[in-house]
Amino acid sequence: MFGVEPISFCEDMTMIRPRIIVIGVGGAGGNAVNNMILSKIEGVEFIAANTDAQALGLSLADRRIPLGGYVTKGLGAGSRPELGRSAAQESIDDILTAIDDANMVFITAGMGGGTGSGAAPVIAQAARERGILTIGVVTKPFHFEGGHRMGTAEAAIEELQHVVDTLIIIPNQNLFRIASERTTFIDAFKMADNVLNSGVRSVTDLVVKPGLINLDFADIRIVMSEMGKAIMGTGEAEGEPRAVKAAEAAISNPLLGDTSIAGAKGVLINITGGMDMTLFEVDEAANRIRTEVAPDANIIFGSTFDEKLDGKMRVSVVATGIA
């Protein structure tokens, strides 16, 4: 349905890498991007886009794009999605210039406010129309934020899911499943951001890092293109049986609710370990996940090395086409 953008060459021309961009839209999206940058994820470019000039000034992103200077004057969208939408439309040429030769774009935003709810669908549609593999990763409000904000969020999600290839939804209310009475507000949101972080890392590691089994970008596109709703999960474990424990943690992410990977049409599995990781362990982890999905699911599998993980294994799963 959509064309594939040409892939850019690395400076030394010895290998080809896809250009992957994460765009944080609005305040929550900008915070998620900052947390990803601080985690030092490799092989990704970052863009922050916001109607709030003050918040944009605090971004750590490679590129910062003010949205709707004429319609918002840099003062934000004031919880009005229609203003966020107009702001994105005003600045869409700046967005398209920044992502013009990208192969994959993750768009992250908080749903329920003005900028994220209004601007994210506009940006997603523009990216996808350019043939860019477009993934949305968004949060839904806490219950205590009220019915009006939740209604705004649900309307924005309904719009967004029609203009992205794959959409991951993280209900903030589910943070209570993993938070304790001592968990700070900042740390709680970092937990939600880790879903985005692990999902992006599971893709980039497979095409950037050396490993037993590497994937090319075409494999990833097959699993994530035009797939609708998805879930992401990452598990890390040490000790025996670390492979199985990591796999089970990856497919039981409490932040994503009660959604199961059982009905997934496509599954991307990334198994990462140190140089002590054995072929038997890779087989164990992959088979543990495979037993959870339908026999006809399209499973794309890769395994990479990370010297920092000696003694540990990390399993990441992206399951797409969730009913």
From Swiss-Prot:
GO cellular component, one term: cell division site
Annotated source species: Magnetospirillum gryphiswaldense (strain DSM 6361 / JCM 21280 / NBRC 15271 / MSR-1)
Expression triggers: Expressed in exponential phase, peaks about 18 hours. Fourth gene in the 4 gene mamXY operon.
InterPro entries linked: Cell_div_FtsZ, Cell_div_FtsZ_CS, FtsZ/CetZ, FtsZ_C, Tub_FtsZ_C, Tubulin/FtsZ-like_C, Tubulin/FtsZ_2-layer-sand-dom, Tubulin/FtsZ_GTPase_sf
Function: Required for synthesis of single-domain magnetite particles and magnetosomes, especially in the absence of nitrate. Forms filaments, which form bundles in the presence of GTP. Has both GTPase and ATPase activity; GTPase is 2.5 time more efficient. Has no activity on CTP or TTP. May be involved in redox control for magnetite crystallization. Mild overexpression causes cell elongation. May recruit other proteins (MamX, MamY and MamZ and possibly Mms6) to a complex required for biomineralization.
Any one GO molecular function term: ATP hydrolysis activity
Cross-referenced Gene3D superfamilies: Tubulin/FtsZ, C-terminal domain, Tubulin/FtsZ, GTPase domain
Signal peptide: none
EC top class, as a word: hydrolase
Compartments, record wording: Cytoplasm
Effect of inactivating the gene: Not essential for cell growth. When grown in NH(4)Cl medium loss of magnetic response. Magnetosomes are much smaller with poorly defined morphology, poor crystallization and are irregularly distributed with large gaps. They are wild-type in number, are magnetite but predominantly superparamagnetic instead of single-domain. When grown in NO(3-), nitrate, single deletion cells are nearly wild-type; in this study NH(4)Cl-grown single deletion cells make a few wild-type magnetosomes in addition to poor crystals in chains, i.e. the phenotype is not as extreme as in the previous study.
Family: Belongs to the FtsZ family.
Keyword Cytoplasm assigned: yes
Protein name as catalogued: FtsZ-like protein
HAMAP family found in the cross-reference section: FtsZ
Residues that hold GTP according to the record: G27, A28, G29, G30, N31, G114, T115, G116, E145, R149, D193
Superkingdom of the organism of origin: Bacteria
Additional notes on this entry: This bacteria makes up to 60 cubo-octahedral magnetosomes of about 45 nm in diameter which contain membrane-bound crystals of magnetite (Fe(3)O(4)).
Subunit structure: Interacts with FtsZ. Probably interacts with MamX and MamY.
Pfam families: FtsZ_C, Tubulin
GO biological process, one term: cell septum assembly
Taxonomic classification: Bacteria, Pseudomonadati, Pseudomonadota, Alphaproteobacteria, Rhodospirillales
Reaction equation(s) it catalyzes: GTP + H2O = GDP + phosphate + H(+); ATP + H2O = ADP + phosphate + H(+)
